[in-house]
Structure formats: C-alpha cells, structure tokens
C-alpha cells in the first residue's frame, strides 16, 4: 500500500499493479480496495494496464478531512493522476462514475473515460422522488445519531431500492455488514456527488474526454434510462450495453469491453 497527498493534505491510500498505460479505478458507494468489485476487477485489468486502485477518502486506509465537498474528491483523483505520470485512463462504477464524470468536466488530465451506470434519475417519477428526499441530509442525521446500520439500510432501501428482506438478510452475511457499517460515514459523500440525482446536462456537456458509457442489459429500467441519457449528454460519447448484466456487473464481462476502448 502507498499513499498520495491530496491538495488539502489528506493522505489517499492506493495500490498499483500491472504494467502499461495507467488506469485509475473509481469505486461507488461503500466500496474500497478491499471490498466491492475492484478486488476482482483490478487484477484482470492489470494484465493489460498499470492499474491504480485506491480507497476514496474516509474509506479503508485513506484519511479524511472535514468539511467534505465533492471538489475534494476530484482533487484526490487529480493527485492520483499526478502519481500515475500526469495523465491516465479512468474507469468509474456507479456513483464513482458520477465522480469520474465530474472530474472530467473539471478538466482533469483523463486520456479516456469509461463509466458504468452512473445512477442518475431521468424518468420524471424517479427524479421527483429523489429530489424531494434530500438523501444527504437524511444520511447525515442518522450518522450524527450514531446509527451507522440505519444509514446503510436507508441507502440500500430508499436510495438503491433493494427489497427490505434482502437488506435484512445482509445483516447475517459474515464480514459483509460490518464492512458496510465501517464505510457508512462516507454515504453522504456519494449523495453529495450525485446531488438530487438529476442528470447534470450542462456539466456533462463540458466533458471533452473521449468517453464510453456502459450499462447492463438486465439492469433496472431507471438505470438503463440513465445510461442512455448520460451517453447523449456527453459530447461524442459511445454507448455500450452488456447483454445479461445488471448493476453488479461481472468483472470478466466488463474487462474486455473497457480494455478494447482504452487500447484503441
């Protein structure tokens, strides 16, 4: 494990594997170098690229500095790009895709960008519900009361839409619930990145990086709509649908698609 110092002095933990052109992986909510899709995805991509896998601030072995703002997370990614040599490919998943798109719109030196299912809400009923909810405030209230588990449940049920019975069962999965609770304090960060979850059309229009927007063919309709809308909003973006995949995309299916895009 190594660290890079972000602009505000926060130490960001990362590990590097493989050789070739640099590729930085950006996790979604509750995930880290040790938990989520990246531990399986990174070694596959490292067969072709020099992969940088990092703990977003407040997670894993990375430090945290208050007050939080999404601009600080963009600066974290900027520091990693500097560590990688000054420019890099970037792959973001879920809310990490939202962060990666914000970074590209901010002008970071991203050679090419691939994003998987940024969870924007573009259908009227979905966007109205999320705009009214003020998820960031709800999460901050629960965390201020020390209710980490309830914050995770709120995220899973009210934001992601996981059925209550599955959330209940997750509490009894060895090693899973404890990891989710450990990262719960960063849930407001992902809520801040996504805002009211509406499609930030003007911001996406500022992206000048070659971009591939990817979605799963079996994902929920709201996510498929978000992927299509994001691909339209980013200038000259490519759209790719992975047959049979959901929001929890299989690393062995995603790897060849992003490899082909970055290597072209």
Language model regions located:
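Conserved hydrolase catalytic core segment
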Residues: 87-126
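Short beta-strand/loop motif that positions the catalytic acidic residue
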Residues: 207, 213-215
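Active-site loop/oxyanion-hole signature of alpha/beta-hydrolase fold enzymes
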Residues: 43, 52-91
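Serine-hydrolase catalytic core
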Residues: 198-208, 231
């Amino acid at each position: 494990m190594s660290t890079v110092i972000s602009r505000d002095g926060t130490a960001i933990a990362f590990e590097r594997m493989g050789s070739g052109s640099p590729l930085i992986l950006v996790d979604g909510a509750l995930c880290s170098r040790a938990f989520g899709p990246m531990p399986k995805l990174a070694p596959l991509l490292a067969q072709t690229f020099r992969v940088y896998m990092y703990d977003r601030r407040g997670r894993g072995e990375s430090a945290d500095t208050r007050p939080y703002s999404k601009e600080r997370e963009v600066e974290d990614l900027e520091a990693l790009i500097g560590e990688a040599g000054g420019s890099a490919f970037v792959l973001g998943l879920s809310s990490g895709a939202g962060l990666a798109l914000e970074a590209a719109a901010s002008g970071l030196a991203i050679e090419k960008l691939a994003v998987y299912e940024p969870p924007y809400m573009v259908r009227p009923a979905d966007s109205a519900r999320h705009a009214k909810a003020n998820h960031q405030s709800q999460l901050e209230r629960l965390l201020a009361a020390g209710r980490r588990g309830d914050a995770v449940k709120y995220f899973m049920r009210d934001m992601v839409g996981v059925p209550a019975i599955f959330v209940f069962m997750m509490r009894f999965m060895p090693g899973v619930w404890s990891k989710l609770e450990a990262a719960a304090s960063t849930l407001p960060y992902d809520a801040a990145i996504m805002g009211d979850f509406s499609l930030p059309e003007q911001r996406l229009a500022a992206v000048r990086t070659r971009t591939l927007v990817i979605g799963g063919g079996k994902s929920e309709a709201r996510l498929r709509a978000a992927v299509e809308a994001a691909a339209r909003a980013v200038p000259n973006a490519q759209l790719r649908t992975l047959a049979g995949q959901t929001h929890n995309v299989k690393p062995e299916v995603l790897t060849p698609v992003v490899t082909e895009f970055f290597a072209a």
